[in-house]
Amino acid sequence: MATVELRFSALPEHVRTARLVAAAVARRSGVDEAVLDEVRLAVGEACTRAVGLHQSSGISAPVRVLLIEEEKQFSIEVGDEAPRTAPGEKVPGAYGADDPDAESEEDEMGLAVISGLVDDVEVTAGEHGGLIRMSWPNTPPAALVP
Amino acid sequence: MDLSLSTRTVGDRTVVEVGGEIDVYTAPKLREQLVELVNDGSFHLVVDMEGVDFLDSTGLGVLVGGLKRVRAHEGSLRLVCNQERILKIFRITGLTKVFPIHTSVEEAVAATD
């Protein structure tokens, strides 16, 4: 199982980097070209959500993205460290504090896009943070051609 | 790749041509542009998305916010988009029912319903 791990400060400008890296690794692992747009969008949504959660909870830890190449599938895990006492519940903070409803609506919309795009998706959250795991089928390259 | 924005007036419509990527980083610029237009009295907007390479839910949120603002002034917000990858995002979120989506700026500018 080959893995690429990416950690980035919870800043909106780094979400694009995460999309680019995820798409590059997905392509390399043999994910169908037609599906790469979906991978890009889904990982962007998951990272956007994690950045929002870190900022609204005042968490300085980076957002973590794992890109996992397996034999028959390619998986992406996006983890945040925002604690929830109940799913979706947030700690008030600086980011979007003036309009918490709008932020929560965008968060919901991000999840709606992910579940609309990806067939194989798991969303979990607990007191130590949340995790979105998404998988796509792949066809790994049969052999390395120099 | 960043976000590019330019506006022009066609009759009583204001066409906003958007290019590049609309995501969590760039969407605030689009939001500012739409808010500014409405504050300046432009209530009939056509957002031309033909140059957009990427759109996420943050961008959708900004467009919905724009629609809400123009509707408060009995205005309209129409989209121009032919790209399947972008249209798909409107479909899976059900927003094709919310936004009139046109195939050309000419068509959007002429539309009245």
UniProtKB/Swiss-Prot annotation, chain B:
PROSITE patterns: STAS. Keywords: Phosphoprotein. Belongs to the anti-sigma-factor antagonist family. Residues 3-112 form the STAS domain. Disulfide bonds: none annotated. CDD domains: STAS_anti-anti-sigma_factors. Coiled coil: none annotated. It comes from Streptomyces coelicolor (strain ATCC BAA-471 / A3(2) / M145). Positive regulator of sigma-B activity. Non-phosphorylated RsbV binds to RsbW, preventing its association with sigma-B. When phosphorylated, releases RsbW, which is then free to complex with and inactivate sigma-B. Phosphorylated by RsbW on a serine residue. The gene is rsbV. InterPro entries: Anti-sigma_ant, STAS_dom, STAS_dom_sf. This is Anti-sigma-B factor antagonist. It comes from the Bacteria. One of its GO terms (molecular function) is anti-sigma factor antagonist activity. Gene3D superfamilies: STAS domain. The modification Phosphoserine is found at residue 57.
